[in-house]
Amino acid sequence: KLAPTNLDIRNTAGSALDQILIGNVYEGIVARDSKNQVAPAIASSWETSKDGLTYTFHLNKNMTFSNGDKLDAEDVAWSINELIAKGYHDADALAAVSKVEAKDADTAVITLKTPNSNLLWTLTGRAGLVFDKDAKYDLKTQAVGSGPYTVAKFVENSSITLKANEKYWGKNKAKTPTVVVKYLADDNAAVNALKSGDVQVLAPITENLAEPF
């Protein structure tokens, strides 16, 4: 279900890409914690000006993308500016943004036209994802992110294989070396796959389908 037809998270709608790529492969300037609150991610801390128009983000040091490229404030500024300029998915949620700049390698500044109390929350989703401004790859079939996993294999409408990112800069490194996410056509096929051991985890599953287990 919800099987993605491609990996282009900047242009393709649907929750499947959010679920599999955000936090695993791509990371945002901020994230959501287990309590669904805004939490540090690429930015370790931030502050807001008294007038609510300027957000200053202080980035973690020594960050890299999965291809080994350095991740800094230039990538942050480029990613958000590109999203707005090209009208990528969720660009409309950043309508209040005037500009995004790299103050220095470790500091990114977002300036607003009018205050937006939802800005940080918006940046926990697609709008805040940070991409490698120098990387050249096919976004529909490949992914270059800064998260704990990389995309090792993608089969359209079928499966995504994630592999632990050996270059991951963060503390919460991948604990499972390889994860294969399969998208099954219907509930019965999914339950049969779980019964046979073809899959180890099944989600979502209804109460009736869970009864045999």
Predicted regions and their residues:
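Aromatic- and charge-enriched surface segment that lines or borders ligand/interaction sites
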Residues: 44-87, 103, 109, 193-196
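Short, well-ordered beta-strand elements
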Residues: 1-3, 54-57, 76-79, 108-110, ...
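Pocket-flanking alpha-helical
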Residues: 7-9, 32, 64, 87-88, ...
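Ligand-site clamp/hinge motif
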Residues: 137, 167-212
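N-terminal lobe/hinge region of extracytoplasmic solute-binding protein
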Residues: 1-50, 144-145
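Surface-exposed binding/hinge segments that line
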Residues: 92-133, 153
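Gly/Pro-rich hinge or "lid" segments in bacterial periplasmic/extracellular proteins
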Residues: 123-174, 178
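Short, solvent-exposed loop/turn elements at domain surfaces
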Residues: 4-11, 37-39, 118-121, 159-161, ...
